[in-house]
C-alpha cells in the first residue's frame, strides 16, 4: 500500500526457535532442542520423549495463494498432539492464527476445543490495541508494519473451553488473548506469537510463568 512505500518491513525470519530458546534459557532451569513440524510428522522426533513441547506457529496459516501449504495443525499433527496430550504431556502453542485458521471445519474445531481446550471468538481488528495483560504484567506486541518487528495485524481472540481459564487479555477491550488448561495434561495457548512480545525481559518472564505452570505439582 502507498503509505508503506519506501519503508523496510520486517517479515518472517524463521529464527523464532532462537527467540523462544533464549527465553527458556533465561529461566536457568531448562535445556531445549528444536525441530521442524515435518520431523515430528515423519516420526523422526517423538513428542513423548519430551516433558514440554513449544509449538511455534508464528504467522503460519492455510493460504490458497501461497506456493507452500501450511496449516496451523495438519491432520497428522492433530493426531500426534492428541496422543502426546493423552500421555500426560505439556504443550505451549502460540501464533497469530491459532483460532481463525482452525475455525473452518467441525473436525478442526473439535481438535482445538476437545484437546487444546480453546475456542475462537474472532480476531482483534482494533489497530490501536497493542497491549496485553496477563501473568501479573502488561506486555506489548507490534500491530502495525515497522522496520524492527514483524507486525501482528489481527491476532486471535481465543476463549477457554471446559475447565480451561483465561490467562491473557487484550487491552483495551478485555478480549481473551490466551488460555491455560490443567487436567491429566496441560496446555497453554496464546492467540498471538510468543516471539512478537516486544521486550526480551517480558518474554523471559512470561516463559518462566508458562514453564512454572507446566511443572508445578
Give the role of each language-model region:
Residues 24, 53, 88-91, 184, ...:
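Residue-level detector of buried hydrophobic side-chain packing
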Residues 37-44, 75-80, 172-177:
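Alpha-helical scaffolding within the catalytic cores
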Residues 25, 45-49, 84-87, 159-161, ...:
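Extracellular/periplasmic catalytic domains that process cell-envelope and extracellular macromolecules
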Residues 143-186, 191-217:
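C-terminal and late-domain segments of enzyme folds
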Residues 10-18, 68-75, 201:
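Soluble non-cytosolic domains of exported or imported proteins
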Residues 1-52, 56-59, 194-196, 208-217:
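Aromatic-Pro/Gly-enriched surface loop or interdomain linker
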Residues 60-165, 171-172, 206:
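A glycine-rich, often tryptophan-bearing local segment used as a flexible ligand/cofactor-contacting loop or short
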Residues 36-38, 55-60, 94-98, 169-172, ...:
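Active-site-proximal beta-strand/loop segments in catalytic clefts of secreted hydrolases
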